[in-house]
Amino acid sequence: MTSPARPAALSDSQLDRVEGVLLGQAVGDAMGAPYEPGDIPFTGTPELLGGGFGDYAPGEWSDDTQMSLYIARVAATGADLTSREALDEIARGFCRWVALDGASDVGVQTRRVLGAVVDSRDEPGIAARMRAAAADLDAATRRTGGNGALMRNGIVGLTRLDDRWATAASARAVAELTHADPLAGDCCVIHAEMIRSAVMGPPWRGGHLPAAAAAMRALDLIPAERRNYWRDLFDGGILSDSRCLEPPSGDGFTVHALGHAT
């Protein structure tokens, strides 16, 4: 697999932020998993309760972090995540996760895509077949904007810290393995750039984290024909702070999930 040049050495502060992305995803996932079905009342303080769709133990992370680990293992080699070899390895990992590694729970959309190709996982070109299965599902349903690609995306924002365009390309390429809706890819591009810029930017001094401003700055990475769609959403308050005060409802749509997560 192709290995692009490594970024310049990171400061201690930047390394702390990198670790925060990885640990924050795992801890936040474990904390949020029991609330996902919507049948547990929120008391104001999230707790590591366990349960959820995967009947998780308290403190156990869910399928989203499980999937992100397969991306992380490939990214850790220094591979270009847009390359055929890297995408094949990620796609093969997703299939192994479902077939062999004990996936605790799989989203409906992701399950359908992986189910279409899992039996051919060891044959060449698995990533291309997975993308084709995702495209077929989109053509059949026109409802492939689920949040699954976004939920596993955090690691991608750390893979090309010196190159925002390469980060964006990687985010879209990995998202498109299972999610053909362009909005799913857009969400992953915006999210990855928000992570990349937060890691590479100046140290946080406390106070408000300008999520909406960071998201707006990522819009040049989105195809021109959809920038106004995103600009209107951001201007309309999709990233409003008030959304963080209680677990959101109806965030299965990737656009809503991006707003709730930030």
Locate predicted features.
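Structured, active/binding-site neighborhoods that engage oxygen-rich ligands
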Residues: 1-262
